[in-house]
Amino acid sequence: VEEKLHRITNKYHDLFADRRHAFPQFVVEHINTVNRNLEISQYFFTDIVKEGIMLYNSGKCELAKPRKLSFREIRDIAQSEFDRLYPYACDFLGVVKEYFMPKEQYNLSAFMLHQTCEKLYYTILMVFTNYLPKTHKIKELSGMVKRFSQELTTVFPQNTDEEKECFDLLCRSYIEARYNKDFSISQEQLEYLIARIDILKDITERLCKEKIAEYDTMTESVIL
């Protein structure tokens, strides 16, 4: 199968080489893998079923329906996603503090701070909901997580023009810090954002660990 897929992929890449279109990307999974992930509502596979277009159906396979997960399964998924996503955020923030800021790479610092926030918000969403939305927008992500704790509403205050400007720069940095030559952010603004994101990091760790502990309690109560 892999050899056949490799030949098909090369053929499509040759066909698209002189075109302005993006190359088609192929993801091949066994039906058992697909159904196992559909059963536990894994977001990548459920989105494909909800939004994908069927091009061919042999009629030999049937897609599974998401089932109600046990508290143990919910807890295990939440722990796995926390262990996967939260360290990324910590590493991104560490790179900003230890490497980009000392070298005065301020635009790269802004971009990596955006990535840190994104991963922290993703961590919260996966632990609390087992779902990731298709957005990189910090404003949207911050709005989505606020329902889980009042603390999250205070991470980026909007009381002064300076606070509003810093948050706006953070939100814009995903694109503009890399591709807009006129994008500019100061050392002071970055230091302010780092301090706020440190707070978000601590809140994220505590909230997620508390939620996972809650799942543990629910699991134990069911067993009893």
Say what each PLM segment does:
Residues 2-224:
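Terminal alpha-helical segments
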